[in-house]
Amino acid sequence: MSSNRSQNPHGLKQIGLDQIWDDLRAGIQQVYTRQSMAKSRYMELYTHVYNYCTSVHQSNQARGAGVPPSKSKKGQTPGGAQFVGLELYKRLKEFLKNYLTNLLKDGEDLMDESVLKFYTQQWEDYRFSSKVLNGICAYLNRHWVRRECDEGRKGIYEIYSLALVTWRDCLFRPLNKQVTNAVLKLIEKERNGETINTRLISGVVQSYVELGLNEDDAFAKGPTLTVYKESFESQFLADTERFYTRESTEFLQQNPVTEYMKKAEARLLEEQRRVQVYLHESTQDELARKCEQVLIEKHLEIFHTEFQNLLDADKNEDLGRMYNLVSRIQDGLGELKKLLETHIHNQGLAAIEKCGEAALNDPKMYVQTVLDVHKKYNALVMSAFNNDAGFVAALDKACGRFINNNAVTKMAQSSSKSPELLARYCDSLLKKSSKNPEEAELEDTLNQVMVVFKYIEDKDVFQKFYAKMLAKRLVHQNSASDDAEASMISKLKQACGFEYTSKLQRMFQDIGVSKDLNEQFKKHLTNSEPLDLDFSIQVLSSGSWPFQQSCTFALPSELERSYQRFTAFYASRHSGRKLTWLYQLSKGELVTNCFKNRYTLQASTFQMAILLQYNTEDAYTVQQLTDSTQIKMDILAQVLQILLKSKLLVLEDENANVDEVELKPDTLIKLYLGYKNKKLRVNINVPMKTEQKQEQETTHKNIEEDRKLLIQAAIVRIMKMRKVLKHQQLLGEVLTQLSSRFKPRVPVIKKCIDILIEKEYLERVDGEKDTYSYLA
């Protein structure tokens, strides 16, 4: 007797697929036609699947006729009730295929938005229904499907994935071209400014993404994007390239580059938003690269030409826009950096040339001109170029070039003119004057000075001139502010190190020590016989101060006692130390009793010595003054010129032009008893012109000598470490080591090498061209 339901020996039921399929298919049909379903009905369908999968079948029935059993992972051929499911799987697959084949008929003739509406709506419905079906078949998924996949059988999927695969094969592939073309048309409409239904595109994209199943692992999480990339993205990117190639070419033909940049900026932003609104995020980088290539890279030459125009016209906003665009291209900024460097260099040269000869003798004008150029382009680099390191470097190179070599340095025939003028500008800032700025403003100005200092190649020249001027300010007690002096030295120390400022700091220390010494000397005088005049000194350590020893001079008798008392006092405190008096730097005050008014004259020691002679006589020849003061004739002539111009002394012919008269030994110089001045306190201690010129020449000479010593020291250091070195390598290392202080000239380095060979620090290696070895 035959029956579809019979008991096996173990008492388990055997349920045939035909018994449940009609009702199951009706339920599935209900799901895919989006009819409402009660929970009880859903459970009935689930139970059908469960009962079938757990019924007892023979292994060949479970797998299906003609399907060879697959090996398990342990090499066994399993069989049994827990593996029933193939026949059900086949029928589900067939159902989905038939459903989609019929559905395709409704959409295969549709185009443009109609096909998109059809595709996205059907996809949403199908996807939802398939998830419901997946739930009904949960037991089948967990057991039979899982086992088949574990066994490595191809073409078996979870039921939801099976639904996607069937959609891909039966509906997506036939409609793919129509749908993709419709999407691309819609995107082009949006690019042309039309409003579109973006949900249609996002629906298609979401479908394409989900259809990218992992064929090798049915249970893998997340799509592979294969379908999306191959069926949509590649065509979308090609379309994008075509669209923007045409648009950019046409736009540039009809509009200025500045307007094109705004357009390109807007388009790049649009495409970025496009991805955010309805494309897959993985498209972002590829799309950006494609747009940048078409909108920017293909037009770089036009950008480069326009960059120069924008610099000339100071169009900072447009320059910033160009930077933002071109910075998207790999190595795209190189040409812009070169153009900026050349432009700043030319602007700097032009600005200094415009000042003309005036800047040669006006440190403030010169430095301010340099700072104005730097300030302008530093602001540009910060605002338009985002303080990009490459553009900062371009600014630095350009400033270094025009500051160290320009119209002023050419007029002076010396690249050392810039550091000298900068040092003189510092002197004008730090010296007492009626125009001294407030402390905060002065600090800010000193910071600006350091901006220029950074670009100075010959920092040793600056140091020499700065040291000389600082020394004078300290000796003449002419500093506007001790705090400002200390601040500037601190800035220089930070920029160049301790060694660079060590002498400057020792000068400060000497001034402090001298103050204490004066107090001690005054105390000493109160305990003995006091002097009949106010006397103070400054004792300076000879190695730290940039002063030459004094020339011959006979101290006036009025000062002799003070001189002797202090010399004895100092010797009692510091045995073995020798004092060398710097009369040319000394000064004092004379009170007059020979004129209608009583004047206080602030005079140099040389001026005092000459004027004090007139306490005994009203007139002297130049020779007599030379004999009594022991001042050399060339210096005496300069001192007398100043006294004659101030009208304290006059020539025998009182109406003679002082500048035109040559002072000879027999020239008579008289005290002018009719001297008048609006001020009762008169400063006649002004620097002598020839003294200034001589000092400048001496400074430059000292710089050259110091450089030779520094170069020799660097060569010895390098050779001591390297032992043997080729000529070119040695030159390179010397230049590198000394570049922070100055730029050594190659002929001078060669000369220093020869000097060291003569001194037997080095020798040339026999048989090897241009090679030196160190002699310990």
Swiss-Prot record:
Neddylated; which enhances the ubiquitination activity of SCF. Neddylation prevents binding of the inhibitor CAND1. Neddylation leads to structural rearrangment in the complex that allows interaction between the E2 ubiquitin-conjugating enzyme and the acceptor ubiquitin. Deneddylated via its interaction with the COP9 signalosome (CSN) complex. (Microbial infection) Deneddylated by murine cytomegalovirus M48 leading to a S-phase-like environment that is required for efficient replication of the viral genome. GO terms for biological process: animal organ morphogenesis; apoptotic process; cell population proliferation; positive regulation of canonical NF-kappaB signal transduction; protein K48-linked ubiquitination; protein monoubiquitination; SCF-dependent proteasomal ubiquitin-dependent protein catabolic process; ubiquitin-dependent protein catabolic process. GO terms for cellular component: cullin-RING ubiquitin ligase complex; Parkin-FBXW7-Cul1 ubiquitin ligase complex; plasma membrane; SCF ubiquitin ligase complex. PROSITE patterns: CULLIN_1, CULLIN_2. Residues 706-766 form the Cullin neddylation domain. There is a cross-link at K720 (Glycyl lysine isopeptide (Lys-Gly) (interchain with G-Cter in NEDD8)). The modification Omega-N-methylarginine is found at R63. It comes from the Eukaryota. InterPro entries: Cullin (IPR045093), Cullin_CS (IPR016157), Cullin_homology (IPR016158), Cullin_homology_sf (IPR036317), Cullin_N (IPR001373), Cullin_neddylation_domain (IPR019559), Cullin_repeat-like_dom_sf (IPR016159), WH-like_DNA-bd_sf (IPR036388). Belongs to the cullin family. PANTHER family: CULLIN. This is Cullin-1. It comes from Mus musculus (Mouse).
